[in-house]
């Protein structure tokens, strides 16, 4: 997630500046510094980082440029079919990156079950939340690059990421609604129905 990585770098630079400014004070109180360092180390060690990815609310896991804390989650897979496309929402995570940036990560998988060339664009999925916020497109910078065109029996998977302005937007999140346009062929003929999925989350 590029934006999260930039945020992590910014936090690192800020920390280095603060350390440089406090250098003289730290040298004159080495015993106090040792105590503080020990405290910081213990605090860091006491924060469990989920190495296998998040599984429940409250989990902290690694992302590019730092960590994210889960505010709401769905581990239940939802699979639907529209025309020749089989579409699965594998996981939904609402989290806050580096205690600053709220986002929703929708992990998906799409499969063309036909030999036709099919155009299907989950990368343009519209999202609405139970908290009353609507985002018309995922963040192109943060989301994985997904196929728009499926040449025969191929599949694709990845994350589509929605970035929010305020943590309140995902606090106590009960569900999301995901809308995706119908698949179509090279002649622009619709091959199925639009998808309109509701995913319930634990929070």
Curated annotation (Swiss-Prot):
It is found in: Cell membrane. GO terms for cellular component: plasma membrane. Keywords: Cell membrane, Lipoprotein, Membrane, Palmitate, Signal. Residues 1-21 form the signal peptide. A lipid is attached at residue 22 (S-diacylglycerol cysteine). A lipid is attached at residue 22 (N-palmitoyl cysteine). The keyword Cell membrane applies. Residues 27-57 are annotated as: Disordered. Its main location: membrane. The keyword Hydrolase does not apply. Residues 27-46 have a biased composition (Low complexity). It is a lipid-anchor. This is SPbeta prophage-derived uncharacterized lipoprotein YonS. It comes from Bacillus subtilis (strain 168).
């Amino acid at each position: 997630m590029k934006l999260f990585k930039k945020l992590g770098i910014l936090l690192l630079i800020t920390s280095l500046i603060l350390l440089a400014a406090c250098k003289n004070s730290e040298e004159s109180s080495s015993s106090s510094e040792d105590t503080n360092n020990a405290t910081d180390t213990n605090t860091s060690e006491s924060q469990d980082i989920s190495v296998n990815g998040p599984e429940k609310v409250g989990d902290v896991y690694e992302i590019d440029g730092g960590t994210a804390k889960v505010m709401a989650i769905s581990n239940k897979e939802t699979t639907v079919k529209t025309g020749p496309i089989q579409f699965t929402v594998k996981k939904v995570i609402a989290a806050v990156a580096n205690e600053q940036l709220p986002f929703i990560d929708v992990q998906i998988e799409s499969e063309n079950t036909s030999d036709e060339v099919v155009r299907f664009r989950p990368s343009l999925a519209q999202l609405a939340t139970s908290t009353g916020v609507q985002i018309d497109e995922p963040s192109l910078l943060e989301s994985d690059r997904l196929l728009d065109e499926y040449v025969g029996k191929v599949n694709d998977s990845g994350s589509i990421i929605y970035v929010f302005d305020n943590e309140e937007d995902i606090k106590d999140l009960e569900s999301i609604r995901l809308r995706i346009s119908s698949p179509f062929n090279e002649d622009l003929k619709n091959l199925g129905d639009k998808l309109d999925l509701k995913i319930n989350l634990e929070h």
